[in-house]
From Swiss-Prot:
Phosphorylated on multiple serine sites. Several of these sites are hormone-dependent. Phosphorylation on Ser-294 is highly hormone-dependent and modulates ubiquitination and sumoylation on Lys-388. Phosphorylation on Ser-102 and Ser-345 also requires induction by hormone. Basal phosphorylation on Ser-81, Ser-162, Ser-190 and Ser-400 is increased in response to progesterone and can be phosphorylated in vitro by the CDK2-A1 complex. Increased levels of phosphorylation on Ser-400 also in the presence of EGF, heregulin, IGF, PMA and FBS. Belongs to the nuclear hormone receptor family. A zinc finger (NR C4-type) spans 569-589, 605-629. This is Progesterone receptor. It comes from Pongo pygmaeus (Bornean orangutan). Gene3D superfamilies: Erythroid Transcription Factor GATA-1, subunit A, Retinoid X Receptor. There is a cross-link at residues 388, 533 (Glycyl lysine isopeptide (Lys-Gly) (interchain with G-Cter in SUMO)). Residues 569-641 bind DNA. Residues 418-430 have a biased composition (Pro residues). The modification Phosphoserine is found at residues 20, 81, 130, 162, 190, 213, 294, 345, 400, 678. A motif (LXXL motif 1) lies at residues 55-59. Residues 1-254, 331-378, 418-438 are annotated as: Disordered.
Amino acid sequence: MTELKAKGPRAPHVAGGPPSPEVGSPLLCRPAVGPFPGSQTSDTLPEVSAIPISLDGLLFPRPCQGQDPSDEKTQDQQSLSDVEGAYSRAEAKRGAGGSSSSPPEKDSGLLDSVLDTLLAPSGPGQSQPSPPACEVTSSWCLFGPELPEDPPAAPATQGVLSPLMSRSGGKAGDSSGTAAAHKVLPRGLSPSRQLLLPASGSPHWSGAPVKPSPQPAAVEVEEEDGSESEDSAGPLLKGKPRALGGAAAGGGAAAVPPGVAAGGVALVPKEDSRFSAPRVALVEQDAPMAPGRSPLATTVMDFIHVPILPLNHALLAARTRQLLEDESYDGGAGAASAFAPPRSSPSASSTPVAVGDFPDCAYPPDAEPKDDAYPLYSDFQPPALKIKEEEEGAEASTRSPRSYLVAGANPAAFPDFPLGPPPPLPPRAPPTRAGEAAVTAAPASASVSSASSSGSTLECILYKAQGAPPQQGPFAPPPXKAPGVSGCLLPRDGLPSTSASAAAAAAGAAPALYPALGLNGLPQLGYQAAVLKEGLPQVYPPYLNYLRPDSEASQSPQYSFESLPQKICLICGDEASGCHYGVLTCGSCKVFFKRAMEGQHNYLCAGRNDCIVDKIRRKNCPACRLRKCCQAGMVLGGRKFKKFNKVRVVRALDAVALPQPVGIPNESQALSQRFTFSPGQDIQLIPPLINLLMSIEPDVIYAGHDNTKPDTSSSLLTSLNQLGERQLLSVVKWSKSLPGFRNLHIDDQITLIQYSWMSLMVFGLGWRSYKHVSGQMLYFAPDLILNEQRMKESSFYSLCLTMWQIPQEFVKLQVSQEEFLCMKVLLLLNTIPLEGLRSQTQFEEMRSSYIRELIKAIGLRQKGVVSSSQRFYQLTKLLDNLHDLVKQLHLYCLNTFIQSRALSVEFPEMMSEVIAAQLPKILAGMVKPLLFHKK
């Protein structure tokens, strides 16, 4: 009992201040209770009497002990006997280790520590939280592994380890080993049994604060099933967070909210690996985050990062335009709901972040972006305008954006899906690596989906519909897409359009992004084409004459007479009666040409030599009519040939399609050859394929420009866009009649037209300027001719100078019509995707055939191998140089398209589709130009 005399050297209590636990803690018990009633001095009793003391639930809490403290004296004696037993064992161990401290000093320090811990003051008015009441089930592990565990001698209590080991310091007589044991975590506990310490200095002592230990601000609690052993290190490591100590222990400890351990440590469930969405820490402190998280990710917004756009430049252009759209994109969640379907992520509720701009695109800083973090192609774009995804081959540095596919649905098997708003997506599966998402769809689905997703209007025009009435059934005919619903992939800034969508918008009609086009009640997909080629004659009425069902695409003959121009006069457009003077003409133009050539009339045009010659106005200007006859190739020497014979032409086309050596014409070619005559030259034979190219050459197209009003930049650009729309339609019609082009896959046909439409237009501009005005002006159309003065007054003078180079090259090289026609076809075939075409073999055969035709056309004028080779080099070099020239036009066109609202420039529908879908790819180098010569 001599240990109580060691209390004398303690620091005296300050009068008027709060009671010091180091001074009064040994006597904080009721008088005449306990085994030491006679050792209490009289001078310390007044101190104790002024302090409210509550020992209930502190020394031996009911939830942990399971016994009723009715006999307080018995309990106190049992508790102190247990402590003395623990002390005696510790003394024996440490005495054997050769401790330098004297036994009385060690005895005093050990018992002081135990009593100070067990008899700490408690009460409802206490300002600082007391240590938790429960203790571990093992023995009093106060000094590390030196104490052997003795479960029968220890109280059967559980809970968080007492903050005794975080005490700042003891009295001066304590040994160094004891002080060290108060500061560090006992090494006797295994890492799985080490319980949480307070994150700051111990709140139970009024001494010097202890440096906070680097504990995590959020602790992941791993839930496990099964019962716990009695000697477990504490239930907090297993199971759900719960209140510590129960209700009985609440009187001795500060109130702790559920899920928060002692010291303000938050307990959060471990993040489920099935959910890829990032979680946000429930407690945001300056302390380091839990292991595995970035130290910077301490706030809610640190987990939200702007998604890294892949190097798919078509996506880059679409995303850039969406960010520039003020009205529809800056609206936050409202704008996002208009473009993306609602998410149903299981972790959405745990991340209440109002960031509608980037749904499910956030990822932790220390992790890689999810493969499916960019659902732009199928989530927010209109179905008819989805960009055809292009892989860059084995060396692709980015993962292609993949759309979310409903499990079990094959987009290739449902061509007639209703196009309503996309359904909510199922819960996201674990992220897959690049290439795994492509396995979910069948290999054949890629061809059909890409065909229906790129160039819907072009697909309408390439397939001529029969106008069959829809099938009758118990339901009404499904609603069809409005004729003028905008087909623009990039959401431009509400620019006016010449299509019917502008009139609908002006009338106040609500813009519907996904008009219903469902058939047969099939499930819907967000990226199916908005054009149903069969059973819907009301789709695209302006292009109805150019549609046809798919059944006609797989006819057995390689070339059919229906694919050729019908019997239409190439001069006036009337019904042709046969091939007269080498050209398919009507009887009226035949007689006119014969009389004009034999009578040697000198006709003069009252206008500008650009009069319209058609069935009604063919007699208005004989000069322009005769000029058109000569341009078509009519000569008097060709009258000896028989009338147009369908069988002969089909046989000739089949012969041309087969690989043949140059200069060895067969019988079919000889029968279908015709003469051409020009001053100073002999009569020469024209190859049949070139003759056919002449017959299918489109007529001059008018721009509809009003020359009575002063020119403005917006009016000129709008007129050029309208002209470009008509010329694009003419290119599609021309390509349909092109021998060999219909043998290609429909996707390849659309791709080739989209890649080469600008080259064909500027090449035709150069030819018209060369033929009509000798390259002195830019002959866009008969009603839109720009001289140098008008070029300077326009806002695209530098662009006009660029386009002016082509007619000047024509003048320099004196290009013939036969050479021009062959070069024009090669321009259609000079750009392909990086991965190639679906029907690559047929494409290469077709291109080789037209290269041979160009050699034949060169041989019509050039005599000798050397001169023909030089000519071939000059013409093919001109084709190669067009790539760089057209790239400047592409860039200007895309910039004008993006700024169309600010510039007040209108873009028609089909032209908008092509610009938005393919120009970003072309400018980004995602296409492969086919060059004749190396640079």
